[in-house]
Amino acid sequence: LSGSILLNTLGGLYVDAERFNKMSTAEAIEYIDSHYYEYIEYDARKTDETFKDASKAEKAIYIVEDFKAYYMSDGICAYFCNDGDTFASDLTSSMREIGLNDAADTIDDFIEKNNIDYSRYIEANEETEENKYPYAAIDNKLASTFDSQCNETIAKYAKSHANELQYIMK
């Protein structure tokens, strides 16, 4: 592939937008996952300060990648119950921005039906929170809406906004 590759400040490789856009979906997702997970771990504060210079696309991908990491490891409760999440109130709008509308609808319906307030950081006891709501049911429903669409949708969105992704592009 043509285009430049640079070493980022965290020790990983950066590619430019031209090279990124030539990647297959699988390659793009592997690149996105490794760079965002690295960034998420590096900037574990997860506050609005994290995004002070970020584009709308950067923030949306970061939030969905953060959710994906929790969800794929232990289900949706891992995201919402593990001390809450600073950006939980932005999750479904970020999903919609990227194009994961069915998953966003599923989560919004779950929150509404269970009268859950994730608009602030929750100091939660994971075990207590997990037993309050039917998380297994939403995990099953998300398996058909999020799991099947997330990687392709994230890759497509990232490619169409590659020039705005300052944290993973150079």
What are these regions (language model features)?
Residues L10-A88, S94-K170:
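Extended, alpha-helix-rich binding/interface surfaces that flank or overlap catalytic cores
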